[in-house]
Amino acid sequence: MLTRHAITRRADADGVDAAIVERDYILAHVVAQLHRATPKDGGTLVFKGGTALRFIHIGDYRYSADLDFTVIGGDVEPAIAAFGDVLEAAKQHAALPYLELTNEDRPAISFIGPLGGAKPRHIKVDVATDEHVESIVRRTVLDIWPDLPDALPFAVYPAEEIGAEKLRCIIQRVQCRDLYDLFRLTEDVGVSLAEIRPLFERKARAMRIDPNSFPDRFEDRIERYKRRWNNEMGEHLADPPRFDNVVRIVRRHLRGAELLDS
């Protein structure tokens, strides 16, 4: 396990709270062991979401707060049981004083890490079985922390699947990170919204969501994104990009995909 000083030094360098960096350290060690997740019913635990962007797809990315998975070909309970094996391996490799899976109202990781403390902190874990998934890839964790184990591949959404779900999420909720993630996916990864639009539409319909509601929902959310931008994104980045610039660029990509009127 890295020292408390190593965590606070990186927090100072990145301009975020040390607790955010410690959580990232724990997440990285958990993700690095995902190859061990083998549900006994033959299902596949597939890593997804913004945390997958940070640890798999984009080296310089925002900090994340939780873990999201989809189970393909299996049920939630065996997948969560297999995830317990992942945590045990992460705990042993990193020599963490405490790392356990709790499953009361919903699954979560409880941990005590390099910063210490009398009480464990928590990371939310979401495991879905109702997602429409068309492709998965096998990737290894990026070398974000110096004491991670040897990288072995595991199942994860490709960037296009994540982008399509981010489009659907804009219809479903108001979270600034969805807008930020679309911004980075289009600008830095080269995801084409025009190419993933049919996938987004299929994902939306699979959840009984009308994809044609996207333009109105997007416009309805802009003011709320703006009010919350600095505070919400400040939990993930020291210096969030200017909101107006992000919206301008995302709008351009959405118009190119005919998801917004020209």
Which residues does each PLM region occupy?
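Structured mid-to-C-terminal alpha-helical surface segments
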Residues: 1-46, 55-67, 71-262
